[in-house]
């Protein structure tokens, strides 16, 4: 039979593991730091507006003059030569 101390220790470990799992798999919200892919990517429909190589901040759209991959990610809806065009 499990003692009370063992039960509490087991429950504590389970809670810690559960919280770590949620943190690792949680998408990032508006204004939070992000990476372009993986567990720290932005929640849809937000996108990661890059600040440096592969990292940035979650935004609704990428402003003119910033790096882009697709026109739909730009506020102007125009991505040309890897940069969002100004409106």
Curated annotation (Swiss-Prot):
Keywords, A to Z, come to: Disulfide bond, Knottin, Secreted, Signal
The leader peptide range reads 1-26
What intrachain disulfides are recorded? Answer: 61-75, 68-79, 74-84
GO cellular component labels: extracellular region
Source species, domain of life: Eukaryota
**Where is the protein situated, by its record's location annotation?**
Secreted
Q: Which Pfam families match?
A: UPF0506
- Domain comment quoted from the record: The presence of a 'disulfide through disulfide knot' structurally defines this protein as a knottin.
What name appears for this protein in its UniProt entry? Uncharacterized protein SJCHGC06711
Record the organism. Answer: Schistosoma japonicum
> The organism's lineage?
Eukaryota, Metazoa, Spiralia, Lophotrochozoa, Platyhelminthes
